[in-house]
Amino acid sequence: MNRVAIVSAKRTAIGSFGGSLKDVSAAKIGGDLVKQALESVNLDPNLVDEIIFGNVLQTGLGQNVARQIAVNAGIPKEKSAFVVNKVCGSGLKSVVLGVQSIMVGDNDIVVCGGVENMSAAPHYTKNARFGQKLGSFELEDTIINDGLTDAFENYHMGITAENIAEQYNIIREEQDEFALASQKKAALAIENNLFSEEIAPIVIKTRREEITFDVDEYVRANSSLESLAKLRPSFKKDGTVTAGNASGINDGAACVILMSEKRAKELGLDVLCYIEGYASTGLDNKVMGLGPVPATQKVLEKLNLNIEDIDLFEMNEAFAAQSIAVTRLLNLDLTKVNTRGGAIALGHPIGASGCRVLVTLVHALIKDNKEKGLCSLCIGGGQGISMVVSRK
């Protein structure tokens, strides 16, 4: 089997809901990003065999946003492209599929990633096509319906976090402390330019000016335990999950360029990291936030590794409650986890986050001179996905 290398790992800065990226299409966000990723390693777009992109909120984007991204990035129309929807795991599953295609010899070079513009996600009505004789039309929100609602229990993802908090006795104060730590780490990372190598700037044209968007705008550097404590529970009257200790609704994209180790050597490209292994699992949808636990255990077992063998972890912070439970159940050293902050601070553009955690992990390993890293996400509906990468 071909050993698969990452030769470029880039992401956009993450936009707030209704923020800088709200009027920029997913196809443009992704296309601009992929173009810059290719340029960063002077890779001829003609050499790319396939483009695989995660995306969850597809309503209104037009046919196959991955194909649109590829064309916008200057990749020839003769090349293949397709979209992956594994909810929050979409962006990482796209990488898994790219790796597999290279390992079996179907492709030499693949661009994989994820994109989401949650701000641009439309509302819709189900009953308009054949008419409604009486009564009003009801609009539904695609963000809530297709991105944030459990299809089996018909309740918000926040309730799954409440379920975990109750099951593992994770109190509100613990969740707020975890959220504050994420904010502080992210703010410090931005202050120290730790994201400079991974962020590709997006130029946004308005009527009056051009704006370069290159700093994560969702981070709340001035957060405090006092301000977090004032927030009301979001999903349950006497609950513990709030807007402050949950991830945001956000816009952004991330991508990696994959190729075999042999191809990288032929092209004279530096390898950032190698993909060592990956695993996906399912579990009870009512506690979907625990998904990283079995997925991580599975990939470590496949690779004959222990948790102590991993130098850095990027665990997607859907909610503080599930993040705390995951770190406890896996017995993670918190000094190794989300060292630049996580989704509670940076944001969670759902189709992009799977690749975003990978991109951040790759650059953290390089900057911190560490060898092995693991990234993982919980997935709405009751799944988990994990991946291990190494620099050697």
Regions from the language model: what does each represent?
Residues 11-12, 23-27, 31-32, 40, ...:
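N-terminal extracellular/periplasmic Venus flytrap/periplasmic-binding protein-like
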Residues 26-42, 65-69, 94-97, 157-164, ...:
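Short, well-ordered amphipathic alpha-helical segments that serve as non-catalytic structural scaffolds
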Residues 261-309, 327:
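Glycine- and Gly-Pro-enriched alpha-helical subdomains that act as flexible
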Residues 86-116, 165-194, 255-262, 349-370, ...:
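Active-site-proximal alpha-helical scaffold in enzymes
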Residues 109-163:
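Flexible glycine-/small-residue-enriched beta->alpha junction loops
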Residues 55-109, 151-156, 222-248, 329-356, ...:
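Conserved catalytic cysteine-centered active-site region
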Residues 22-89, 93-109, 115-134, 199-214, ...:
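Conserved beta-ketoacyl condensing-enzyme motif
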